[in-house]
A protein has these predicted regions:
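Acidic/negatively charged segments and metal-coordination signatures
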Residues: 1-49, 53-55, 63-146, 150-385
């Protein structure tokens, strides 16, 4: 099938008609559309069409969407977009559903839906709200990716200071509440005075991660607030800061593990991202085993620990509110003990590495090669005993 871009227009009835009666009835349950138990397929399609083209409902869905999601929707209306079956793209729109995916992976926006969208978009009041929401969303994405949790007062100070938006707390809280009513606690949400990453969702099945533990680790430390251009890079959840320690880590992967340059960059980016998500060294070692790093080669392992801990200590972490461990120690020497204690726990999970690095013996009073800043005898040396 073709999309609208090549003069092939799909009506909502055509798209819905490709679903089975069972699938259509499931949609009626999700959308709270009442139909008779013995309703015919066309009757179900008509009822669903009326719901999906409701201007007020579609407006609510649009206002709950993020900036990138709006761009995604408009792209699908303008040209062919083909996605893999397992792709996470268009998840929000597919889940509602506003868009549909054909058997050959083409994303379809029904013609009636596109018409209602264009009508809503032309409304000046909607356009003004959408413009402000775009700013909120981009900054919210950046802040939850960098900090995981940020108090709403600080967030507004950052947004207003960098954009001149002059947003007030009631406006932001109201939108976050409306957004959650539509899509739950996806991406980010507001609770207890904090804007939180979705990993701390309180309304989901399974284990709940307590954000208070993160706040306790952060303590009273201030936020690292980068310039606008740098901060907004974090709106991309896969953004990786190309620091000198990152470059050194990638060079190690390329030279010592025999990987191609682009492979080394992918591995380095992956490791930095899982570090920011709280991965401990034991988790990193488990990942690195796939790429040829083994405990049997002690010299290789020793050198790896050095470059790994250097990248860890120079990566911006949520636990230090966007500061690197090195920056946090310089800014607040009182945190040195806390950070060293954490490093002590970290090194206890490392593979055993004999007291040498690069063939050179490490003496008890030498600085530990893991980067903790402690003497070897009080860090990895104690573990190796």
């Amino acid at each position: 099938m073709k999309n609208q871009s090549e003069n092939k227009v799909y009506t909502l009835a055509e798209v819905l008609g490709k679903h089975t009666i069972a699938e259509l009835k499931q949609m009626t349950q999700v959308l709270e559309v009442k139909v008779l138990s013995k309703a015919k397929k066309q009757e179900i399609i008509d009822a669903l069409s009326a719901k999906l083209l409701d201007k007020e409902l579609l407006t609510a869905w649009l206002l709950a969407a993020g900036k990138q999601e709006i761009e995604e929707l408009e792209l699908a209306m303008a040209e062919d977009v083909v996605i893999a079956e397992e792709s996470g793209r268009f998840y929000y729109w597919r889940n509602l559903p506003v868009v549909f995916v054909t058997g050959d992976g083409v994303v379809v926006v029904p013609s009636e839906t596109a018409a209602v969208y264009n009508e809503i978009k032309s409304d000046s009041e909607y356009a003004q709200k959408r413009s402000r929401i775009n700013v909120f969303d981009e900054y919210l994405m950046a802040c939850v990716n960098l900090y995981r949790a940020i108090d709403i007062t600080t967030f507004l100070s950052i947004v207003n200071g960098q954009t001149g938006l002059n947003a007030k707390r009631p406006e932001l809280e109201s939108w976050l509440k409306d957004r959650e009513a539509v899509r739950g606690q996806q991406m980010y949400f507001f609770e207890g005075g904090y804007i939180l990453s979705e990993e701390y969702r309180t309304k989901k099945e399974g284990e709940v991660v307590d954000y208070h533990q993160l706040l306790e680790r952060q303590g009273a430390m201030s936020y690292y607030i980068p310039a606008k251009s740098e901060l907004l890079r974090y709106a991309d959840p896969y953004y990786v800061e190309k620091t000198p320690s990152y470059a050194a880590f990638c060079r190690f992967i390329q030279v010592r593990l025999g990987r191609l340059e682009n492979e080394a960059a992918v591995i380095g980016s992956h490791i930095q991202l899982i570090m920011r998500h709280g991965a401990m060294p034991k988790d990193i070692f488990a990942e690195m085993e796939r790429f040829g790093l083994t405990e049997e080669n002690e010299e290789l392992m020793s050198d790896f620990i050095t470059v790994m801990m250097d990248m860890y200590n120079n990566t911006r972490m949520p636990e230090t509110r966007g500061f690197t461990t090195v920056e946090a120690q310089k800014a607040d020497p009182s945190r040195q003990k806390k950070i060293a204690s954490a490093s002590e726990i970290v090194t206890s999970s490392m593979p055993i590495v004999k007291n040498r690095i690069g063939g050179k013996k490490i003496y008890p009073n030498d600085l530990c090669p893991c980067g903790s800043g402690k003497k070897y005898k009080k860090c990895c040396g104690r573990v190796n005993k």
